[in-house]
Amino acid sequence: MTTTDTAPQSQPFQAEVAELLNLMVHSVYSETDIFLRELISNASDALDKLRYESIAKPELMADGGEPKIRILPKKEPDTLSVIDNGLGMDRQELIDNLGTIAKSGTKSFLTKLTEAKDGAGLIGQFGVGFYAAFMVADRIVVTSRRARSAEAWTWSSSGGAGFEIAPASEEDAARVTRGTEIVLHLKKDAAKYLEPYEIERVVGAYSDNIQFPIELVPEEGEPRQINSASALWQRSKSELTAEDYSQAYKQIAGAFDEPAMTLHYRAEGRYSYAVLLFAPSTKPFDLFEPARKGRVKLYVRRVFITDEADLLPSYLRFIRGVIDSEDLPLNLSREMLQNNPQLAQIRKAVTGKVIGELESLGDKDPEAFGKIWDAFGLVIKEGIWEDYERRDKLLALSRFTTTKGENRTLKQYVEDLKENQTEIYYLVGDSIERLKSNPKLESAAARGIEVLLLTDPVDAFWTSAPLDFGGKPLKSLSQGDVDFGQIPTTEENKDEQAKPETDEALTIAAIKDALGDKVSDVRASQRLTASASCLVAGGLGPDRALERMLAQQNRGAASKPILEVNLRHPIVAAVAKANAADAADLSLLLLEQAQILDGELPEDPAAFSARLNRLVLRAL
């Protein structure tokens, strides 16, 4: 090619790339096969992009032949080449795509990759698989020509602090007429990847369902296709095995685990489309990154369009797979994707199918569903807050730890309601252990009432919506009034129903006088049987747990709580009989004890300590 400056230009890697390359160059990961899977996946993406852009610009397909991927092993020197005749890259795209990682969550990814015993799965999840090639190569040379461009460029690196980029030599430019050629100079311990049978093994395991032909070009003999090159989702379920689905999942999702759920069907009628979706069995590292998109790919008549179409609601963002429409136009713009009524109908129908399949799995295979719930239950519960239309189904799908055990459903809860019980009770907190010892459970426990123990951060939000299940409203034990009067205590707790001997009005008045505006109210508790006091929120505001969470995020100050006291408790009974100073100390102690039990610090820890010491010394 002709150029005025053919000298290579050296450029440094972005800091995150340099750190990632250092991990790859000195990799101890056992799954080195990932490098070939990732390079083939990138080549397939480039062919997809070419096919998509050629819809509007057919001339892009004029040079370079039919779309395919070629793998060339050469033992003299020890090089392995992966070549595609896809869209290709220009100089700036080579720099941007191979010299930087323009993704949110990069630091989190690198931290997890450093800590992982085997990071191969993380590499695929984050979409930086090109760099995995440095696990097997000590030098990589990439030559690329964008479709219909007069110029080809060569990028090269030995995995150090930077890379070189230069116009391609005449020989390289003549060889790469469209697309990208990646040449790996293999390390000595990676020589096995030069063997045709080893290449076929890796392609068969990870890339068999790539839609484009993958050709193995041996040093001796004729090139031959080594993958099936079929859109698996277009085939009948009866033709496919569990192994077929496993391979398709790993190829589509860039994963190493097995799918916990597979949903494959074809919709016919007003709109026709094929669906192949998977629920992973392990949680991806970036599940809660704010910028994380869904991972479902949209195809139109087997042409890849985008993976940014929000084909499922955000609370199903862990689902991976493909939706292939027969009816959508191929030239969909991003704006059209957002406003296309046909796509909205597909989204609604597929979302319903996914939730239905999860329900069915929960009934038929609790163990498989348990893997999904353990990994993604926290995300699914976001939908209870976000998706009013499907709220009841998501509540039915949810599994809870309760005072009766783990993995309980609301259906089971309602079936086990106590005599005269009309509400579903729950308590939100930081940990199961702390919730189990929370004094607000005492009166419920005395009656054998089951209580949901909620510890995920999202629980404080979805429970703030007005909810019911099976006609039974959900009720927080940390908010508003609780009346267990119509529900009898168990035989061993009969004494809990005995009336207190303490003068309620006098005691409440004394505590209110001592606490002043530190609380919004003081009242006798229906929640407590053994503890002296607890704090609750008013009936109309948010739950105490949500108030604390919002306050910690500077999204509003927590309102003043209500102090509930157990009139049967000796400390509470002592307030009305004590002198003014002791009554004040006892009242403040009741408040501060309740704060500690709620996971809060007393307003003045030093004063709390001094007050406690005074009361103890007086009792000696």
Swiss-Prot record:
The gene is htpG. Signal peptide: none annotated. SUPFAM superfamilies: ATPase domain of HSP90 chaperone/DNA topoisomerase II/histidine kinase, HSP90 C-terminal domain, Ribosomal protein S5 domain 2-like. GO terms for molecular function: ATP binding; ATP hydrolysis activity; ATP-dependent protein folding chaperone; unfolded protein binding. Molecular chaperone. Has ATPase activity. This is Chaperone protein HtpG. GO terms for cellular component: cytoplasm. It is found in: Cytoplasm. Residues 549-620 are annotated as: C. It comes from the Bacteria. Residues 335-548 are annotated as: B.
